[in-house]
Structure formats: structure tokens, C-alpha cells
């Protein structure tokens, strides 16, 4: 990604004239979310400036704040930065390097819909096929069964050695989790519990947290309508610049 970003925060890379982060903020606003916390790593002052200008603007959430994840320690650790911001409410998590196009409904709204119906933690899932695997990141395959828009996840494999892109593991297609979630307020305590079980120095990722949710029967998948674009990869970013138009 450095070959494209060239020192720019990747969250601010332009797609159809707007930063990647802006597309996700607009998606949140279209989904009815008025309060957003953007978690950033140290030294990304440009993101803070962008957020200050964007908050309350046309098509943007009314309140957008930033908080710093002091060191890169995994997605679950980044989620935990938002504990005080979320209070005792469920929290939506949307990763800016995952975009969705050609959907009848924003991806954030879709996972919220499934949460409202199931009252469970929700992870967005999508189908990966051979023609797009090389432009999607190396997330694990989720075995399970689809029921309408729901996806009953059988298991979530732990992260092991992997390449730089998605592996179908010989299958013609496979389901995987992508960067749209709803977590119940209890997820923050669960993240703390999972952290205590990790080996020293091990990253506090979302996978072991969702594995614990699945074991407790409190996690469900939502099959997301629309085309998933992984702009965290150069190939995915180029695809997104060709397909995304400002709405």
C-alpha cells in the first residue's frame, strides 16, 4: 500500500474525489448513526483535521471524534479504545479499508438490522470467488450455513501462516468475515478476558474474541448485499477507484 499512499495516511487515500474514511463516515450517516469515534495510530494529525472539518457536514454524522490507539496491538484492542465512548450501548465497528458498492442498503445498516432482530453480536460476511480472491485480504474461511440474510457460523479458524491475499483453499467459493460488525456492550469485558488468556506479546485481534462469542452462542453472521472491495490492497484500491462514485 505504500506504493500508492506515498506517506499519506491510507485512510485519506482518495476514491472518486473523497477520502476512503469519508466514504465510511457517509455510510454510517446513511445508516442512522450520528456519533462516531475514529480510532487512529499516533502521528496521524491529518486524520484529526479531516474529522474536525467533516463533522456535521452534509451527509456526515453530527459528532465525530478521534482517539489514539497508542500501539498497534490488534483490532480488538482498537475496539476497546472506544469503551468510554460507547458507554453501555452496542457499538458498530466499520473498517475504512473495506468498502461496499452496488448494495440496496448500506453495509452498516445491514448489520444493524440483523442485530435488531437477533440481539446478538454480528459480523458481516461475504462470498469470495476465484476471480476476486487476488484483490481481497487474507481473512480466514468461515464454514457455516446460510439462512436468508443470516449466516450460521460453524467455526472461525485462528490466524496462522498466510499469504498476502485470500486463499480459497481449493474451493470454488468461500465465505469470510469483513469489516462491518455490531458488538454488544459486554464485548469490552470479553476483550479483557481474552487478553488475559493470550501469550505475552500476542496481538489482541478480533478472531479470538469472536471465537469466544461463537462458543457462547452470541455471534451471528450477516450476508452482506453488495460488492466487497478491499482497498487495503493495491489491487483492491485500483478496483475501487474504477467502481466507486460519490453518492
Q: Where are the regions that the model predicts?
A:
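A phosphate-binding catalytic loop at a beta-strand-loop-alpha-helix junction
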Residues: 1-5
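Conserved N-terminal catalytic core of the sugar/cofactor nucleotidyltransferase
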Residues: 13-14, 18-93, 99-104
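Short, conserved catalytic or adaptor-binding loops enriched in Gly and charged residues
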Residues: 54-61, 114, 145-148, 211-214
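Conserved core of the sugar-phosphate nucleotidyltransferase
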Residues: 101-189, 193
Amino acid at each position: 500500500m505504500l506504493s500508492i499512499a506515498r506517506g499519506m495516511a491510507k485512510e485519506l487515500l482518495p476514491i472518486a474525489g473523497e477520502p476512503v474514511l469519508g466514504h465510511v463516515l457517509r455510510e454510517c450517516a446513511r445508516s442512522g448513526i450520528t456519533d462516531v469515534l475514529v480510532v487512529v495510530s499516533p502521528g496521524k494529525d491529518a486524520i484529526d483535521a479531516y474529522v474536525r472539518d467533516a463533522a456535521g457536514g452534509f451527509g456526515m454524522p453530527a459528532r465525530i471524534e478521534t482517539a489514539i490507539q497508542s500501539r498497534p496491538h490488534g483490532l480488538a484492542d482498537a475496539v476497546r479504545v472506544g469503551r468510554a465512548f460507547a458507554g453501555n450501548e452496542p457499538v458498530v465497528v466499520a473498517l475504512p479499508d473495506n468498502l461496499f458498492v452496488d448494495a440496496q442498503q448500506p453495509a452498516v445498516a445491514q448489520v444493524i438490522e440483523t442485530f435488531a432482530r437477533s440481539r446478538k453480536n454480528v459480523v458481516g460476511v461475504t462470498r469470495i470467488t476465484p476471480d476476486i480472491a487476488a484483490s481481497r485480504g487474507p481473512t480466514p474461511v468461515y464454514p457455516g450455513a446460510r439462512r436468508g440474510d443470516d449466516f450460521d457460523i460453524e467455526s472461525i479458524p485462528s490466524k496462522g501462516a498466510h499469504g498476502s491475499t485470500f486463499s480459497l483453499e481449493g474451493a470454488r467459493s468461500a465465505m469470510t468475515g469483513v469489516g462491518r460488525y455490531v458488538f454488544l456492550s459486554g464485548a469490552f469485558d470479553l476483550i479483557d478476558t481474552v487478553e488475559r488468556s493470550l501469550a505475552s506479546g500476542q496481538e489482541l485481534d478480533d478472531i479470538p474474541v469472536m471465537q469466544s462469542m461463537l462458543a457462547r452462542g452470541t455471534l451471528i453472521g450477516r450476508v452482506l448485499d453488495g460488492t466487497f472491495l478491499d482497498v487495503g490492497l493495491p489491487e483492491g484500491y485500483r478496483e475501487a477507484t474504477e467502481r466507486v462514485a460519490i453518492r
